[in-house]
Amino acid sequence: FAAMKATALNLPIDNSLGFAYVLPYKDNKKGITVAQFQLGYKGVKQLALRSGSFATIPNATDVRDGELISRNRLTGECKFNFIEDAEEREKKPVIGFVSYFKLLNGAESTFYMSKAEMEKHALRYSQTYRSANPKVKAASKWTTDFNDMACKTVVKLNLSKNAPLSVEMQDALKADQSIM
């Protein structure tokens, strides 16, 4: 069923493309391994693009030390002063992740999570990342590609909380990381 979900969403299952994945998931209660559908970062962006509602494609980036100027937890508004020099920016530690989109009607949304908030999210939702087995944890996408997973997460959460969602996008977000 996991592969059928990707097909229904017209998203290719190919690790090199990053649209959708079918991953093994150990169901400890039943003692079996089952297929899990996982929506990729490019898949999230592709579905948003297909909706025709966006003036700018939802995007995300890491936030480096000194770049976050202010954050209003009530309105979600954030102000940033991004470091333009790539080499200088790389020297600074990552402190968080931010997603942004603008709709055709002019509405905009920015969604920020600190690195600590993202770490909690990863531990809560990733079975492999919270594994006591060092080999299992080392193989987790959250271990090998933390920044990519974090960027996907802020885009997904920004869309699910703040964007008008097409039926296709609602279905994809609901199915993401579900056992099929």
Tell where the protein language model's regions lie, with residue ranges.
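Single-stranded nucleic-acid nicking/binding segments centered on His-rich, glycine/basic loops
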Residues: T153, A163-M180
